[in-house]
Design a protein with these regions (language model features):
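Voltage-sensor/pore transmembrane module of 6-TM cation channels
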Residues: 1-15
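Membrane-embedded alpha-helical segments of multi-pass membrane proteins
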Residues: 3, 24, 89, 132-136, ...
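Juxtamembrane membrane-interface segments at transmembrane alpha-helix termini
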Residues: 6, 32-41, 59, 123-127, ...
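Primarily membrane-embedded glycan-assembly and transfer machineries that use lipid-linked glycans
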Residues: 13-130, 178-187, 210-230
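Short alpha-helical "patches" and their helix-cap loops
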Residues: 24, 47-48, 133-134, 146-155
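Hydrophobic/aromatic-rich transmembrane helices and adjacent perimembrane loops
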Residues: 127-141
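Aromatic-enriched
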Residues: 141-230
Length: 230
């Protein structure tokens, strides 16, 4: 799962340098230990992953795999490097969105974006992995400062993911590859909406709302610095 890596990167670029560096070093150390203990399987796993499929799970196409790679596989008929590249792009997109929102003072919202990004970008993200929608929904309900379109889209996304209507679709035995356009839309809609929320968050950060929020945070930090000096 990409959650630790995405959260580490988010911490680093959001200004929490020490937390980000410690997390990244821990990741490298654990990965190195894995190679030392299981050199062959580790080499096979990462080598196959670079081609778009780790080979450890045959269910990438399954309807409840709500990841970018899952969507790519259902649309294209197979997991491939293109899906992996798209997943990396979404990871970068989500990281940018989270950092921008953090700098706008929306820390809880930013952390939820980072968590959801890790699920969208992971090769396998079963629908029950989406526990991030719980704090995400709470933040959206309580936070009146966020742009209304982000709150509405985010709450709808949380409800859609929680009820998971795509589970009503036929599944197993790669039947997902034969879905009609409407079935395909229902199955992939949550991922589309999740990516749209990431894009919408970046757009919001560059609107007057975002600029005002960053300016307010800068004044707040400067005020705290002056208070600390006195």
């Amino acid at each position: 799962k990409l959650t630790p890596a995405l959260i580490a990167a988010y911490n680093f670029f959001a200004g929490k340098r020490k937390a980000g560096i410690v997390s990244f070093i821990t990741f490298l150390a654990c990965t190195a230990i894995g190679f030392v203990v299981l050199w062959g399987p580790s080499l096979t796993y990462f080598g196959m992953l670079l081609s778009g499929d780790s080979g450890l799970n045959s269910g990438i196409v399954f309807k409840t795999n709500q990841s970018v790679l899952g969507v790519w596989t259902r649309l294209m008929g197979e997991a491939s490097r293109g899906g992996l590249v798209l997943s990396v792009l979404v990871a970068v997109l989500g990281l940018v969105a989270a950092v921008l929102m953090h700098r706008a003072g929306e820390v809880a919202y930013a952390l939820c974006l980072a968590g959801l990004t890790s699920l969208l970008a992971s090769p396998i993200s079963w629908s029950h992995h989406y526990v991030w929608i719980v704090p995400f929904g709470i933040v959206l309900l309580r936070n009146q400062r966020l742009p209304e379109y982000l709150r509405i889209a985010g709450l709808f996304y949380s409800i859609w993911t929680a009820f998971a209507p795509f589970k009503l679709l036929p599944g197993d035995n790669n039947v997902e590859l034969t879905y009609a356009p409407l079935h395909m839309l229902v199955d992939n809609f949550g991922v589309y909406l999740g990516v749209a929320i990431l894009i919408g968050s970046i757009v919001a950060a560059y609107t007057p709302w975002g600029r005002d929020r960053r300016r307010a945070q800068l004044h707040l930090r400067n005020g705290e610095a002056i208070t600390a000096e006195t």
